[in-house]
């Protein structure tokens, strides 16, 4: 209370242009008057929050969905799973048979996840394709191969305690908000360096004395090579060459520069998280009362929002994609067969350690 009468100056990390971009996207894309959206823009490496909206109209609802609405995150959980896979010997060309599958679990129950529209390849698919089309069978096979506890433990590292280690966790049955989701993704986007997201840079009194100054943690929480290899894999979402039995999830959107992206959907929510070394954006759309999404237009709000932010960043900044470390080897592969193809798609493979 001693500071209350000192005329405090609060310096935030927010960028008015990014804030405006999020507000415009919310206004332009949410056609249904009752559908809600929340979005956040973050600067990788520093973890500064550059923009944040908790709903589409603050005058009608002050509830901050970005930080307080805990919803199932769907397939946006999968990059965390595939980070663990890369840590445990998987590569972009690791394959699993893709067909309708009933899994027998350790407690003698069964689990039968399905793909979108019940579409399957009915053959082996590789990790890159599984990411591009957001394949559920590949995700659950990976999850059970690694052990259900591994993914739960990784999520808990980010301070999310209420995580149930079960088979469906691989498909995003975790309830959290997009602030926490962005916090996890930003660690991958920052080459494994963890800094908690923040909005206040410093606070001074009317004499200019600093009362509070943000301090970075700069903790190397995740493996740098695995994060870089994963970021390269997440570019597959935009690549129409993967659109076979299912569409690559972001193939409808053409961007000038290279970006990583993962989408997610449940019956009641649609999400997208995208990033490059300059910016990360996460967006959610849905109804507050958990009604099913009605129109295909509303289901694309999150995708369009992240694309708007990526395009704005590309127009106003010199965006350069990540570079592989000396431990990673760039290899071009045919997207479907996984064979070497000099005209194929380049992914980063971990070199075998001698």
Where are these regions (language model features)?
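Short, glycine-anchored, charge-dense loop/turn motifs used at functional sites
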Residues: 43-50, 158
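A penicillin-recognizing enzyme superfamily signal
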Residues: 12-32, 40, 52, 59-62, ...
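Mid-domain, small-residue-enriched loop/turn segments at the edges of structured enzyme/sensor domains
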Residues: 110-115, 147-185, 192, 199
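Second-shell loop/turn segments in exported
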Residues: 7-13, 63-71, 113-118, 126, ...
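Conserved structured core elements
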Residues: 4, 16, 20, 57, ...
């Amino acid at each position: 209370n001693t500071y209350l009468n000192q005329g405090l100056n609060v310096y935030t990390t927010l960028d008015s242009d990014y804030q405006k971009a999020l507000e415009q996207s919310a206004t332009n894309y949410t056609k249904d008057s009752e559908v809600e959206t929340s979005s956040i823009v973050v600067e990788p490496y520093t973890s500064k929050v550059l923009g944040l909206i908790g709903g589409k109209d603050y005058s009608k609802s002050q509830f901050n969905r970005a930080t307080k609405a805990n919803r199932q995150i769907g397939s946006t959980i999968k990059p965390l799973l595939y980070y663990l896979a890369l840590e445990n010997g998987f590569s972009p060309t690791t394959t699993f048979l893709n067909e309708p599958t009933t899994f027998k679990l350790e407690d003698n129950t069964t689990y039968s996840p399905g793909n979108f529209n019940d579409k399957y390849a009915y053959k082996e698919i590789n990790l890159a394709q599984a990411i591009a089309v957001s394949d559920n069978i590949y995700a659950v096979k990976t999850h059970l191969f690694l052990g259900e506890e591994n993914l739960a433990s990784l999520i808990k590292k980010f301070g999310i305690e209420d995580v149930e280690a079960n088979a469906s966790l691989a498909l995003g049955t975790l309830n959290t908000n997009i602030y926490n989701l962005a916090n996890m993704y930003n660690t991958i986007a920052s080459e494994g360096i963890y800094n908690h997201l923040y909005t206040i840079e410093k606070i001074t009194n009317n004499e200019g004395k600093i009362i509070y100054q943000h301090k970075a943690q700069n903790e190397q929480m995740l493996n740098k090579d695995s994060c870089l290899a994963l970021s390269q894999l997440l570019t597959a979402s935009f690549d129409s060459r993967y659109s076979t039995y299912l569409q690559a999830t972001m193939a409808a959107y053409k961007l000038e520069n290279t970006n990583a992206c993962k989408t997610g959907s449940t019956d009641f929510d649609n999400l997208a998280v995208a990033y490059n070394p300059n910016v990360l954006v996460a967006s959610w759309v849905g109804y507050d009362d958990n009604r099913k999404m009605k129109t295909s237009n509303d289901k694309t709000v999150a995708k369009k929002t992240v694309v708007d932010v990526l395009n704005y960043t590309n127009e106003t900044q010199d965006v350069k994609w990540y570079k592989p470390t000396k431990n990673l080897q760039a290899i071009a592969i045919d997207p479907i067969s996984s064979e070497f193809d000099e005209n194929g798609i380049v992914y980063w493979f971990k070199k075998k350690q001698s």
